[in-house]
């Protein structure tokens, strides 16, 4: 009876006894709008195992890596569009970043919280970087996939000066 939610269109194959339901994302119209702002589609798919040994194979829409996180009553923030699938018990909400809008970087995050399995995907390879308390690390906003809620982040231009900002992106 295990249930997994996935982005619509992510299913590659599944056991014939897996039950599939289409669901709208979010709670109500504002929840659906918030989910869409956070990078989720308007609909998701819910897969429920009805027999022992049921399986499902999922893949993102583009090439790249998939990685698994086991959440245990904690919260992560994921880049818009990184969510592939997760346990039904996880709560997912969209969250725009005022920091990103002011800086022009356009970072929208998905807040994923609770306990359960979570699969995220990325265009390209995934590198996991564990930070020590107080350690700083610079990541381009277009390449950041996810981070724990305990991480404090700021959005800055990597290059100094107007010409350097245009030339470096």
Predicted regions and their residues:
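Phosphate/adenylate-binding glycine loop and adjacent helical scaffold
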Residues: 1-169
